[in-house]
């Protein structure tokens, strides 16, 4: 099959579905004369977005900054913690059941707590929440990568009388790297989601989440959807950045070999998300 | 096995005690009004208003929710949590059913898979939860009870992880087994029931775990937009009163924790049942 | 070379002028098989042997109606291959045992019977009978992953024979087993199939295996696969461990080996005799 034909096969069906979907939406709204405050037509969302673009963009920057800061700190904390857990078994035993429990709990409800402890007028509570959630995702995955080196590799290194630190450098860390990228691809969109869901729980009145709820509350639905579009774009951008980072860091590496260990999030990536496609 | 479970439970309790101790320790050591680093309020306030004592939190559970009434707050919070749990469970079941159905349809008609799958996958990178207020707005207009809308959003969020995982699982049957069913002249649907679905179960289980947490969060967030009185709503309203009644907020947090653990327990039980008689995955 | 094949109505399998080309008409067309004429009689044990890529597995799948030939016809039990498959006239076994990991051994054996619509009592009694036959009566309630490779293959064979089909198609079923287990399984297979007079078509790339098991060995050339030789192996109906050390056994092995080497010379393909074991 030629390359052109292959690309055609991949692009055309989703394009057709997309066009059909938007078209049907538009038609239904017009034919049934659905009130704009209920469900706006795609065309009106588009025009409102055009009018509002600078506001949406500003909100994207704010939420995006929160997500980015939280993501960076979360990755650093997660990685650091995973090393500590690997080194000190006592800490591992204590932290792991806690992590499992926290995995189950919707800790987003802690945002008001943070608002209380820190200043609710700054972005700190939101960034802290993102950091927390991202740390757990990264921690669970990287710890697994550091621990689960293939038995064959371990035997080989032992036969070379490698010291623990050499084993760390030569086997564990490279193994953990691919897990790190898996975690990153999950954590990036989760950071965005957490950032703006945090905004629903009060705090300063800016950002995408605030834009969505405030506009929805006063029935300016088309404007509200505009912020939704902004949120989708932001989430997609973060995910693509993570994929790009993975490709740049190690062109030959595929993080597709294993089951990701996931923290809670609103939208998770199943294994099929990696463009490389292959699975464990 | 029993001793391992007991040990884990004991360690969990120890871990909780450690966390509580750290909390109290910080209260003693930390600055009352917090502190700023590089202009950011990074060091939290340790006043009793901002960080109640752990025993105050526990004690608050037994005080009434609203002054003058008799019911202690733990009852109210339990009621909220149970309500949220039921909505999340309904959402999980509904979303799961649709997710499995869609996966089967996509497995049957490859054309549909090519058209829809990119969207299903992309939906997991974009924040669908942004639609919660919209759904609430639409729902507010129709006469259906509000909790159904909240459940629907949970279902919407649970739908995608399960659809993706199921589709992957349906394709994971061994080629030799598929040929075998072919050699028995078993049709597509019989092959689905006897081979592909059972083969898909190990892949579906992680998807179900994700869907469960997604549904819970979807429901909690939707409560805020719709005003349905579950544990999400409670944390928001208590949070708004945090300056006058700081410990109250933490009761809602405990409620949310209980809800999460209950859902987690349910999923673990389902996993154990679904995966009995299957070979254990080898772990290092 | 072979003697001319009489087409008789009692022939279990008749392959007539069959060719198989994949991606036919496109630039990447692959001619897997060309001009295959083969007649297998009821009760025969026929091995298909040849180097990797010679199309022996393809030929087996054509007989099984898992794929359709580009030209020519395949008759099984006097019917078209398709009708045979729909009537479930044969049992099949692969290199991977293909057992369902979520079913017990017993339920795995019952699978074809379920698909045939048998009642529960009838299924269970037949499954017990098959377990007895392959000497795994104690393992009926076990899960497949609890069994060794050889035992799993025995279950696969029991499953393939569960409905007592007249024809058994096997694609390198012992390929993944170690040598000792393999020899043992070969003896078991002869015992089981001999008792029921089952016709067997057996794909292998091991010369000793083909000679030990078969009444006839069909030699295929490298791609595009043609039948270059059919060697009669008259080691008798009763074969056991002593057979492996008989002079005739070695003589037949040499005959097959030379036929394979000769086949290599006849092909237009680039490769030599690869993928054939001398063990």
Question: Which residue stretches match the model-derived regions?
Answer:
Chain A
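Periplasmic/extracellular loop-to-transmembrane helix junction in inner-membrane transport proteins
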Residues: 3, 31-75
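Generic hydrophobic transmembrane alpha-helix motif, especially the helices
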Residues: 100-137, 144-145
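Transmembrane alpha-helices
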Residues: 128-132, 165-198
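C-terminal transmembrane helix and the adjacent membrane-cytosol boundary/short C-terminal tail
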Residues: 89, 178, 225-280
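Transmembrane-helix boundary motif in ABC transporter permease subunits
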Residues: 69-99
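Glycine-rich helix-loop "coupling/hinge" segments at transmembrane-helix boundaries
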Residues: 116-117, 146, 193-231, 254-258
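N-terminal signal-anchor transmembrane alpha helix
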Residues: 8-31
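Short cytoplasmic-facing helical segments at TM-TM junctions of multi-pass membrane proteins
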Residues: 141-180, 209-212
């Amino acid at each position: 099959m030629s390359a052109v034909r292959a690309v055609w096969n991949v692009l055309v069906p989703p394009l057709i579905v997309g066009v059909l979907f938007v078209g049907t939406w538009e038609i239904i709204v017009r034919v049934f004369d659905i009130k704009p405050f209920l469900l706006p037509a795609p065309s009106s969302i588009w025009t409102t977005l055009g009018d509002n673009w600078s506001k949406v963009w500003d909100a994207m920057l704010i939420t995006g900054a929160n997500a980015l800061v939280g993501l960076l700190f979360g990755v650093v904390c997660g990685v650091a913690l995973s090393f500590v857990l690997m080194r000190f078994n006592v800490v591992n035993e204590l932290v792991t059941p806690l992590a499992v429990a926290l995995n189950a709990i919707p800790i987003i409800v802690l945002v008001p707590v943070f608002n209380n402890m820190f200043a609710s007028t700054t972005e700190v509570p939101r960034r802290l929440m993102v950091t927390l959630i991202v740390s757990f995702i990264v921690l669970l995955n990287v710890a697994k990568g550091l621990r689960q080196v293939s038995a064959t590799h371990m035997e080989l290194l032992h036969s070379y009388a490698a010291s623990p630190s050499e084993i760390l450098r030569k086997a564990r860390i490279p193994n953990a790297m691919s897990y790190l990228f898996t975690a990153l691809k999950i954590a990036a969109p989760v950071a965005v989601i957490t950032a703006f869901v945090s905004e629903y729980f009060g705090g300063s009145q800016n950002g995408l989440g605030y834009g969505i709820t405030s506009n929805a509350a006063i029935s300016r639905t088309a404007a509200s959807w505009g912020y939704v579009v902004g949120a989708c774009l932001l989430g997609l951008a973060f995910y693509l950045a993570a994929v790009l980072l993975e490709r740049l860091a190690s062109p030959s590496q595929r993080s597709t070999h294993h089951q990701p260990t996931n923290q809670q999030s609103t939208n998770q990536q199943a294994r099929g998300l990696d463009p490389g496609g292959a699975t464990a | 096995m029993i001793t391992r479970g007991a040990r884990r439970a004991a360690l969990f309790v120890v871990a909780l005690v450690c966390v509580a101790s750290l909390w109290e320790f910080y209260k003693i050591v930390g600055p009352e009004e917090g502190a700023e680093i590089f202009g950011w309020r990074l060091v939290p306030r340790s006043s009793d208003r901002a960080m109640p004592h752990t025993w105050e939190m526990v004690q608050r559970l037994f005080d009434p929710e609203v002054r003058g009434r008799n019911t202690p707050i733990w009852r109210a919070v339990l009621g909220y949590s149970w309500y949220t749990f039921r909505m999340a469970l309904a959402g999980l079941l509904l979303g799961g059913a649709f997710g499995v159905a869609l996966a089967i349809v996509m497995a049957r008609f490859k054309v549909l898979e090519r058209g829809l799958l990119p969207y299903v996958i992309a939906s997991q990178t974009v924040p669908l939860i942004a639609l919660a207020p919209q759904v609430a707005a639409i729902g507010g207009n129709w006469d259906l009870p509000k909790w159904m809308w909240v459940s629907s959003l949970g279902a919407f969020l649970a739908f995608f992880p399960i659809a993706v995982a199921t589709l992957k699982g349906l394709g994971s049957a061994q080629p030799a087994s598929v040929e075998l069913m072919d050699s028995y002249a078993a049709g597509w649907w019989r092959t689905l029931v006897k081979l592909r679905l059972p083969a898909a179960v190990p892949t579906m289980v992680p998807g179900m775990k994700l869907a469960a947490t997604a549904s819970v969060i979807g429901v909690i967030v939707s409560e805020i937009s719709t005003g349905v009185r579950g544990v999400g709503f409670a944390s928001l309203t208590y949070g708004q009163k945090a300056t006058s009644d700081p410990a109250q907020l933490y009761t809602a947090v405990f409620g949310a924790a209980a809800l999460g653990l209950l859902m987690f327990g349910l999923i673990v039980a389902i996993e154990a049942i679904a995966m009995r008689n299957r070979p254990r995955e080898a772990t290092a | 070379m072979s003697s001319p094949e009489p087409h008789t109505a009692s022939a279990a399998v008749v392959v007539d002028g069959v060719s198989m080309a994949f991606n036919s008409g496109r630039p990447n067309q692959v001619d897997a098989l060309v001009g295959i004429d083969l007649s297998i009689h009821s009760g025969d044990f026929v091995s298909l042997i040849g180097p990797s890529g010679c199309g022996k597995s393809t030929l087996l799948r054509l007989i099984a109606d898992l794929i359709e030939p580009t030209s020519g016809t395949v008759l099984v039990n006097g019917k078209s291959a398709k009708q045979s498959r729909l009537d479930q006239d044969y049992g099949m076994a692969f290199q991977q045992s293909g057992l369902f990991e979520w079913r017990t051994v017993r339920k795995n054996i019952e699978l074809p019977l379920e698909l045939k619509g048998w009642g529960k009592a009838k299924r269970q009694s037949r499954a017990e009978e098959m377990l007895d036959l392959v000497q795994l009566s104690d393992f009926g309630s076990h899960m497949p992953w609890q069994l060794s490779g050889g035992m799993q293959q025995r279950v696969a064979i029991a499953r393939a024979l569960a409905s007592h089909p007249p024809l058994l198609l096997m694609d390198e079923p012992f390929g993944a087993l170690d040598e000792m287990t393999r020899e043992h399984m070969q003896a078991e297979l002869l015992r089981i199939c001999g008792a029921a007079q089952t016709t067997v078509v057996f794909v292998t790339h091991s010369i000793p295996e083909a000679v030990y098991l078969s009444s006839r060995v069909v030699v295929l050339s490298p791609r595009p696969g043609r039948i270059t030789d059919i060697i009669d192996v008259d080691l008798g109906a009763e074969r056991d461990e002593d057979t492996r050390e008989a002079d005739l056994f070695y003589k037949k092995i040499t005959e097959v080996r030379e036929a394979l080497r000769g086949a290599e010379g006849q092909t237009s393909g680039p490769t030599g005799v690869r993928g054939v074991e001398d063990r």
